Amino acid sequence: MIVGSEKYTTRQLLAWFWRIFRRVKLQSFINAMSGIVRVGLDFAFIWATKLAIDLATGVSSSSFIPRPSTLFGAGVLLISIMAFQLALGYLGRWIAALMGVEAQNRMQRHIFEHLLRSEWRGKEQRHSGDVLNRMVSDSQTVVNVVTDTIPQALAVLVRLVCAFFFLFSMDAMLAVGVTAILPVFILLSRLYINRMRAITREVRQTDSRVQATLQESIQHRLILKTLERVPLLVQTLSSLQATLRHQVRYRTLFSSTSNLILNIGFGGAYLFAFLWSVNRLADGAITFGMMTAFIQLCGQIQGPFRELTHFIPAIISSFTAAERLMELEETPLEDDGEPIRFCHGAGIRITNLTFAYDAHSRQIFRHADFDFPSGSTTAILGETGAGKTTLIRLILALLKPNEGTVEMYSEGEAAVPVSARTRCNLVYVPQGNSLFSGTLRWNLQMGKPDATETEMFEALHLACADFVNTLPDGLDTRIGEGGAGLSEGQAQRIAIARALLRQGCILLLDEATSALDQQTEQALLKNLIEHHQQLPVKPTLIFITHRTAVVEHCSQVITLEKKK
C-alpha cells in the first residue's frame, strides 16, 4: 500500500492524480485499450500455436471455437495474428509518442501558468533551478505514469487474470501452484514501497541541487572568473554529483536485490511448471500442444508479475514527483478578474502603511502615509534598504500591506485598493537589465503586442534609443540572454521604450536612468516630461532615484529613512 508523506495524505495525492488524469484521459484510455487488445492477440497466438502442434502431431480435440482443420489453415491463422500484433504495436507507439508530447506540454503549461499567475511573497522560497527541475523532470514522470504506466499495469492485470483462468481450465493444480508466489509478492511490495519512496525523494532533491548549481554558475560565470572561484564551483558540483551517485547506487542496489529475490521465486515457479508438464506428458495426460500452451501460459502469468515489479519504482517516483509539483501549486493565485481601468488619470494614496516581509524581519514601513496625486511627478529618495523598491512593489500589488491601505483614486471615481486587477493602469521600468532574449521588436511588443513600427520608433526616440536605426537588422536585431549584445545603457533605454508603448496612467521608474551618462539622462528626462505634458490625460510619474538630475524635474520629493 502506498502511504502519504508527512505533508500530503494518500487521499490528497490520489485526488491530485485524478485531476491530472482527467486532462489526459483520452490518451490513457487509448493506451489501456491497446494493451488489452494486445493481451487478446497474445492468447489467440497461444491457442493457435497449440492448434498447429496438435494438427501436426495428429491429435484431435473438441472445441466450441471455430478453427481451421488443416495445418496450412493454422499457419495462416498464426501469420494473421502476428500481423495484427505488429500493426497494433506500430500504431500504438506512434499514437503514444504524439499524444505523450502533447500531454507533457499541457502539464508543463499548467505548472508554468500557475507559477506566473500566483502571488509573489517577496522572497523566492525555491531556487529557479529547482523549480525548472520540477517543471521538466517531475511533470514528465507524472505524465508518463498516468498515460503509460497505469494503462500498462491495467493491461498486465487483465493478462494475469486471463492467463490464470486459461491455465486453470486446462490444469487447476498447475495454475494454483504457479500463482502461489502472489502473497509473497504483495508482502515484499509493501516493505519495498515504503523504503523506496524515501530513497527516491532524496535522489530528486539532490538532482535539483545539482541543476541549481549548474544554472547559477553558468548565469554568473563572469563573476566566477573575475573572483577566480571556478575551481571552487567545480569542486562543489563534484561533491553534489558524488552524493547523487551514492544515492543512485544505493537505490539501484536496493531495487536490484528486491528484484533478485522475486526473480528467484519466478524461476522456481517456472521450473515447477516445466517439470509438472513433462511429468504429465510422460504419463500421457496431455499432448505436446497442451504442454506448449502450459509453458506459454506460465510465461503469461509470470510476465505480469515481473512487469509489476518494474512498474512499482515508476509509481513510487510519480508519487514523489507529485508531492514536489503540489508544493509549487501551494501558492494561491492572484485575483485575475475583470481589469479596473482609470480612463481619466489616477493617483496613489497610501494610508497607515505597515509592512515587513515576514514575522522575523524588520518593519520596512510603520504607520506610513504617502500621496501621489494624479498628474504629479514624484522622486523617491533614500538610502539602501529604506524601502524604495518595496514601496513600488506595494503599489504594483506584488506585495500586500500587513496593515493599512494602498489605493488608486481619481477625481469623480471611488478609490480602489490596488490589486492584480488595477495593474493595467501601471507602467513599470525595473532597475537592472529586464530584457528577454530574442529580437528588439519582440521586446518592444511586450509593452504593446499590436504596436506598429511607427509607434515603436516614436517610443525609441523618446527613450533616446535612436541607435536602433543604425543597427544592420534594426528592430529585428537579436539579443542574447540578459540583453547580451547591448550595453547596459542601451538595454535600459530599450526597456524604457517598451514601457512607453504600454498604455497606463501611472509610470513607475526604479533607477531607470542609473546606467546612462549625464547628457543622455537629461535628454531622456526632457523628452519624457514634455511628452507626458502634451497628453490629453497627464500621467502620474514616480521615480526612484539617487540622481539629482531627476529630482530637478519633480514637483514632489519623498525621502525614506531606514527603520531600525
Report residues per predicted region.
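An intracellular "coupling" helix at the cytosolic face of ABC transporter transmembrane type-1 domains
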Residues: W18-K25, W120-R121, S137-V146, I150, ...
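ABC ATPase nucleotide-binding domain helical subdomain, centered on the C-loop/LSGGQ "ABC signature"
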Residues: R109, E327, T405-E407, E411, ...
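Transmembrane helices of ABC transporter permease
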Residues: R23, Q27-V37, L78-I81, D148-E202, ...
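Helix-to-loop junction immediately C-terminal to a conserved catalytic motif
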Residues: L396
